[in-house]
Amino acid sequence: MAKKGNITSRNLRLSDQIQKELAEMIQREIRDPRLGLVTLQSVSLTPDYAHAKVYFTVLGAEPETAAAILKEKAGYLHSLLFKRLHIHTVPTLHFHHDTSVEHAIEMSKLINEANATRAKDDE
């Protein structure tokens, strides 16, 4: 069985499937204008498949507001997943705002500033 660290290939496949299903369900089933545009970045499952950390980014809304709405709808999304996935245990969903994109943008700006400063010093 292929493993990445201590994550099995089944864990990775199920994580990907949950991410795809949730992305579709959030777009089609949750009709809350306060939510904005949610993009699911990744899903991380515990080894026993009991819990899933769902990492998301959001445009057009505050991350805290989006997280609160997703947390409120987690039970509903869980029940929809149960109907779609046909597996014995559907993990409990835990939504987390993914700040890695913001950090990457910030780091890119710092690198660009450093390069601009270096270019001025070289002149």
Swiss-Prot record:
<dbReference type="InterPro" id="IPR023799">
    <property type="entry name" value="RbfA_dom_sf"/>
</dbReference>
<dbReference type="InterPro" id="IPR000238">
    <property type="entry name" value="RbfA"/>
</dbReference>
<dbReference type="InterPro" id="IPR015946">
    <property type="entry name" value="KH_dom-like_a/b"/>
</dbReference>
<keyword id="KW-0690">Ribosome biogenesis</keyword>
<dbReference type="GO" id="GO:0043024">
    <property type="term" value="F:ribosomal small subunit binding"/>
</dbReference>
<comment type="subunit">
    <text>Monomer. Binds 30S ribosomal subunits, but not 50S ribosomal subunits or 70S ribosomes.</text>
</comment>
<protein>
    <recommendedName>
        <fullName>Ribosome-binding factor A</fullName>
    </recommendedName>
</protein>
<keyword id="KW-0963">Cytoplasm</keyword>
<dbReference type="Pfam" id="PF02033">
    <property type="entry name" value="RBFA"/>
</dbReference>
<comment type="function">
    <text>One of several proteins that assist in the late maturation steps of the functional core of the 30S ribosomal subunit. Associates with free 30S ribosomal subunits (but not with 30S subunits that are part of 70S ribosomes or polysomes). Required for efficient processing of 16S rRNA. May interact with the 5'-terminal helix region of 16S rRNA.</text>
</comment>
<dbReference type="GO" id="GO:0005829">
    <property type="term" value="C:cytosol"/>
</dbReference>
<dbReference type="GO" id="GO:0030490">
    <property type="term" value="P:maturation of SSU-rRNA"/>
</dbReference>
<comment type="similarity">
    <text>Belongs to the RbfA family.</text>
</comment>
